[in-house]
Amino acid sequence: MMNFRQRMGWIGVGLYLLASVAAVYYIFEISQTYNRLALAQVEKTSGAQAKWPGDASSSSPSSTSWIVTLKTRLLLLPFWVWATIFLLPYLQVFLFLYSCTRADPKTVGYCILPICLAVLCNRHQTFTKASNQISRLQLIDT
């Protein structure tokens, strides 16, 4: 029998996945802004000479703002950088919601990377302390 926390965890997982599918559908099917930005970026990079908006070779460097320059440079980042930026937090939230569906409440949150690293480091320190105490006891007993 599932308790209330587990039921809410499964509802949270379902809603999170539903919202994710809706967001991906909106970005890749509905949003005309994304399509225009993608086409403009392809047209810029397919040209013979790509100019940076902040370069000295551009015709009027003061006419472009730093926001346009930043937006242009961010669009030039490779796909794996964007995938890492968006997938790491997405997976962390998903794993936290999934860990809420576990029967043992002590294991909630162990899937989150910082908590997982803290638990592993704490176990390593505890093991080191225990082995040092055992070696001291052996020295005292002899």
From Swiss-Prot:
Chief localisation class: Golgi
Locations listed in the record: Golgi apparatus membrane
Gene ablation phenotype (knockout): Knockout leads to severe developmental defects in zebrafish embryos, including heart edema, insufficient cartilage, and skeletal dysplasia.
GO biological process assignments: lysosome organization; regulation of vesicle-mediated transport
Keywords (A to Z) from UniProt: Golgi apparatus, Membrane, Transmembrane, Transmembrane helix
Pfam families reported for this sequence: TMEM251
The protein's name in its UniProt record: Lysosomal enzyme trafficking factor
